[in-house]
Amino acid sequence: MRCIREAFASDPALSGIVITHGTNTLEETAWLLALLIEDPRPVVLVGAMRPATALSADGPLNLFQAAQVAVSARAHGQGVLVVMDGEIHGARAVTKVATQGVGAFSSPGRGPLGWVDDAGVHLPPSPQQQTVPFAGLHLPSQWPQVAILHEIGRAHV
């Protein structure tokens, strides 16, 4: 978060930011950033469902499309976005709906905000600036150490 805020503060010409992220917790990170980042420039999260060694790896195209969205004037004011499989989702609506296949993310009840294809970014103008409830939250310079316990239901480990 600090890096995002510093990047935007230090470079007024910066169009947007792309963050590559694993897909298991991508929606949670997007949600958190949507609560904390108040800059109107887009922060775009992107991941891949197939490994880079797959014959049809989706990562390179997803990354390219995320960069297209990040520099698009249409993404300005849209808040934090997730770009996967040619679709653009808002951080507050997106969820992972499948663990296999490239169409793993969806915005149930809303659908994607837009899409990206060979012709470019298709994203309607934002009706209003996103509200950011915790934008002024102070981030500590030191975070406490937190233990993480791993547990697998019914597993005999």
Question: Over which residues does each language-model region extend?
Answer:
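Structural motif
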Residues: 15-16
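Short Gly/Thr/Asp-enriched flexible loops that form oxyanion-binding sites at enzyme active sites
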Residues: 19-41
